[in-house]
Curated annotation (Swiss-Prot):
Keywords: Cytoplasm, DNA damage, DNA excision, DNA repair, Excision nuclease, SOS response. Its main location: cytoplasm. This is UvrABC system protein C. GO terms for biological process: nucleotide-excision repair; SOS response. The lineage of its organism: Bacteria, Pseudomonadati, Pseudomonadota, Gammaproteobacteria, Enterobacterales.
Length: 610
């Protein structure tokens, strides 16, 4: 423990009420956040002679200050604790490295409802089905639904401005409600109801109704209609036969855990209406010496209680581990949801099968992750040896992308001991330079990236500059001129240039802009990690450049029209479904856009035509 922190004097001031405490190191950084039913009793336990673990010993040795926040209840303390953990990301807490809201399938409340993927707050009028584990699962489900139940998935701005059916109608993926006379209101509403039942897990009702309609059509000698409905029935059956369905039809989240070699995997199965919608594996950041019980307890708390995560709480949560705070967690979740949430650890029947499945998936994912980590570790060790460094814990790589000097974008990608750290990838729009001047672009991005305060844990060991000697010279100049508090001499600057044939394996590396570079054997693990991060940076830069170029392409034609500012451009593109839709629109259609007069509509029409 630090000599400067007087634990005895501090503990005399602490209350015995429930609350949250924050521990700080000498640099004023929060290193641990915890909660307690009795703050005095809990904090006193840190300053006993016989501490429970090495992790606690290491934590206490760094304490310089402790702040406490008193709360009314233990539930309030639990919620505040996880909000503080999310805010401060303390190094001695187990951290859930995921900050994305889960996607849902949204069925709008329009006259002719549409299906779409939705993330975030649920403000729009309509119904939400999910959550799904990722965007891919939603897109796959939407594609499947479009084949079985052809209701529209287009934006309202496109739907409102159609005068003839689109390609989706031609290939049988949409009933074409945008054009009058193609589908009756009753038929469209019926298909929407099928979608609603299907997404609610009521497949049997869908099949019963479809079979009844097929028989009616057949009796009325409407054989084409009967055949179409028969195909729908077969498609629904093919989908439902592939999935294990629980007899309960309940909404569950099932959480399985695996722990090995200091790494934890938490696997979550999302079950709605008795069906597995999907699953996802998480690898929380676990400080050394952490017990499995703390990993599970902290993960579950962060997963459900951090407000910005937009989690949808099921009626029941099945856990692979018995928690000491299970009752407190259930009460907190129930209070948050405004209804009863059950937390169970010893399920039976179908629930036990789900828990076994989650546990198996967690173990499999952890084995795969450890194998991948071992490969990355070997490559980074080899790279450290080549570069004569003690170790390489963090690498950053930069690349520049543009088209004939326009829409220049720089990318920065980050690797740590586990490989790509995609949450820390960044793109930088480059402005104020001569078009096509890659050196100036590199100079600008490096100054923006490193010309500011950086946490010690974020200082890279190696900075890879894609582009060879010239780009490396720019990097050296930038670092020589940096006026920063962190150790700017710590990162090793390394230039990488492709060979004459620009083939993988023929790269040349440079420590200095002058003189000859050196190459590594094609089978070198060190070269492989360099190629990996260089390719990631290249792809990230190109992706950003393409987005920027597409944005300019969609707006540049309008920017030259007098009277059409940013807000009107946005409104025009939104209502017309993009620039192409606007080009195809008549004067009368353009004039229907809010804020566009008849005179301005004529000006826009003729400007785009000529």
């Amino acid at each position: 423990m630090s000599d400067q922190f007087d634990a005895k004097a501090f503990l005399k001031t602490v209350t015995s009420q429930p609350g949250v405490y924050r521990m700080y190191d000498a640099g004023g950084t929060v290193i641990y956040v915890g909660k307690a039913k009795d703050l005095k009793k809990r904090l006193s336990s840190y300053f006993r002679s016989n501490l429970a673990s090495r992790k606690t010993e290491a934590l206490v040795a760094q304490i310089q200050q402790i702040d406490v926040t008193v709360t009314h209840t233990e539930t309030e303390a639990l919620l505040l604790e996880h909000n503080y953990i999310k805010l401060y990301q303390p190094r001695y807490n187990v951290l859930l490295r995921d900050d994305k809201s889960y996607p849902f399938i949204f069925l709008s409340g329009d006259t002719h409802p549409r299906l779409a993927m939705h993330r975030g707050a649920k403000h729009a009028k309509g119904e939400y089905f999910g959550p799904f584990p990722n965007g891919y699962a939603v897109r796959e489900t939407l594609a499947l639904l479009q084949k079985i139940f052809p209701i529209r998935q287009c934006e309202n701005s496109v739907y409102r401005n159609r005068s003839r059916p689109c390609l989706q109608y031609q290939i049988g993926r949409c009933l074409g409600p945008c054009v009058e006379g193609l589908v009756s209101e009753e038929e469209y509403a019926q298909q929407v109801e099928y979608v609603r039942l299907f997404l609610s897990g009521k497949d049997d009702q869908v099949l019963t109704q479809l079979i009844s309609r097929m028989e009616t059509a057949s009796q009325n000698l409407e054989f084409e209609e009967a055949a179409r409905i028969r195909d729908q029935i077969q498609a629904v059956r093919r989908v439902t036969e592939k999935q294990f369905v629980s007899n309960t039809g309940d909404d569950l989240d099932v959480i399985g855990v695996a722990f090995d070699a200091g790494m934890a995997c938490v696997h979550v199965l999302f079950i709605r209406q008795g069906k597995v919608l999907g699953s996802r594996s998480y690898f929380p950041k676990v400080p050394g010496g952490t017990e499995l019980s703390e990993v599970v307890e902290t993960f579950v708390g962060q997963f459900y209680l951090q407000g910005s995560q937009m989690r949808t709480l099921p009626g029941e949560i099945l856990l692979d581990f018995n928690l000491s705070d299970k009752t407190l967690l259930a009460d907190s979740l129930s209070e948050l949801a405004g209804r009863k949430i059950n937390v169970q650890t010893k399920p039976r029947g179908d629930r036990a099968r789900y828990l076994k499945l989650a546990r198996t998936n967690a173990a499999t994912a952890l084995t795969s992750k450890l194998s991948q980590q071992s490969t990355v570790h070997q490559r980074l060790t080899a790279l450290a040896s080549v570069l004569k460094l003690p170790e390489v814990k963090r690498m950053e790589c930069f690349d520049i992308s543009h088209t004939m000097g326009e829409q220049t974008v720089a990318s920065c990608v980050v690797f740590d001991a586990n490989g790509p750290l995609r949450a820390e990838y960044r793109r930088y729009n480059i402005t104020g330079i001569t078009p096509g001047d890659d050196y100036a672009a590199m100079n600008q991005v490096l100054r923006r990236r490193y010309g500011k305060a950086i946490d010690d844990s974020k200082i890279p060991d190696v900075i890879l500059i894609d582009g060879g000697k010239g780009q490396l010279a720019q990097a050296k100049n930038v670092f020589a001129e940096l006026d920063v508090s962190w150790d700017k001499n710590h990162p090793l600057l390394l230039g990488v240039a492709k060979g004459v044939d620009r083939k993988a394996g023929l790269e040349t590396l440079f420590f200095e802009p002058e003189g000859e570079g050196f190459s590594l054997p094609p089978d070198s693990p060190a070269l492989h990690v360099i190629q990996h991060i260089r390719d990631e940076s290249h792809d990230h830069a190109i992706g950003g450049h393409r987005k920027k170029r597409a944005k300019v392409k969609n707006t540049s034609s309008l920017e030259t029209i007098e009277g059409v500012g940013p807000k009107r451009r946005q409104m025009l593109l939104k209502y017309m479904g993009g620039l192409q839709g606007l080009r195809n629109a008549s004067v009368e259609e353009i004039a229907k856009v809010p804020g566009i007069s008849q005179g301005l509509a004529e000006k826009i029409f003729w400007s785009l035509k000529h």
